[in-house]
């Protein structure tokens, strides 16, 4: 007792950080709430537990678990988690006189109160050479996916899930591998919209504009976006 108090004169208990794994058992067991759990918003909202602290208490995002849903970005009150913007690269391309086409997600109608023509006009005023709705690509996806579903059902497959949501695809691949075989092989609306643009002008650069973080991650997987 004397030796312990000499080493730690201000407390009778000491937690060894070398041994603690932050399991929370002490917090749950203490009847006097002397051990306080400080919630971490980004950790708490992550549906796949992809965010955690390392041994130094620094938060890290595990890419092998992340499904790019964006909940952590919305939850962080300090703006510590943010997207890597490509706005500067786009503006540089426009400034160089390159043909840059804006592919706009249908969700834009719910993001702004102004008439859609005014929004498209603003994009062209910025320097985009053309604006195309991703809904055009969605029509292609719908048709191809419908045919694929018919084929899968004829083969005896019980059901088929969409290929349009990149967040769901990541969820299936990383956390529900048994569901991966049911994902449609049809490309997403973004992909087919980019194909439409490239068919008209192979040299055109395509820029996806939409609120979905996972779809912006998806754009990095396709060379034509």
Provide a role label for each language-model segment.
Residues 11-59, 66-78:
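Hydrophobic alpha-helical bundles that form the membrane domains of multi-pass transporters
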Residues 8, 37, 126:
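Residue-level signal for short amphipathic helical patches enriched in basic/charged
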Residues 1, 18, 34, 107, ...:
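Conserved short-loop catalytic and cofactor-binding motifs
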Residues 46, 60-65, 87-96:
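Short cysteine/histidine-rich metal-coordination sites, predominantly Zn2+-binding motifs
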Residues 6, 39, 44, 52, ...:
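Generic structural signal for beta-strand residues in well-ordered domains
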Residues 1-12:
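Single conserved hydrophobic/aromatic residue that forms the stacking wall/gate
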Residues 83-225:
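Iron-sulfur-associated redox domains of electron-transfer enzymes in respiratory
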């Amino acid at each position: 007792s004397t030796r312990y108090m000499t080493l730690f004169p201000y407390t009778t208990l000491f937690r060894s950080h070398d041994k603690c794994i932050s399991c929370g058992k002490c917090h749950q067991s203490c009847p006097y709430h002397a051990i306080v759990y400080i919630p971490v918003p980004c950790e708490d909202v992550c549906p796949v537990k992809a965010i955690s602290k390392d041994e130094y208490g620094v938060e890290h995002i595990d890419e092998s678990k992340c499904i790019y849903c964006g909940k952590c970005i919305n939850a962080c009150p300090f703006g510590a988690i943010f997207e890597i913007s490509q706005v500067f690269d786009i503006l540089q391309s426009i400034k160089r006189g390159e043909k840059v086409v804006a592919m706009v997600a249908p969700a834009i109608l719910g993001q702004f109160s102004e008439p859609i023509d005014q929004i498209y006009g603003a994009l062209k005023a910025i320097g985009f050479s053309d604006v195309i709705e991703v809904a055009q690509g969605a029509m292609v996806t719908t048709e191809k996916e419908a045919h694929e579903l018919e084929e899968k059902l004829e083969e005896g497959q019980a059901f088929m899930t969409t290929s349009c949501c990149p967040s769901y695809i990541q969820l299936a691949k990383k956390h529900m591998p048994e569901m991966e075989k049911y994902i449609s092989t049809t490309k997403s609306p973004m992909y087919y919209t980019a194909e439409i643009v490239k068919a008209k002008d192979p040299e055109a650069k395509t820029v996806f504009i939409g609120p979905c973080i996972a779809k912006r991650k998806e754009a990095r997987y396709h060379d034509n976006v």
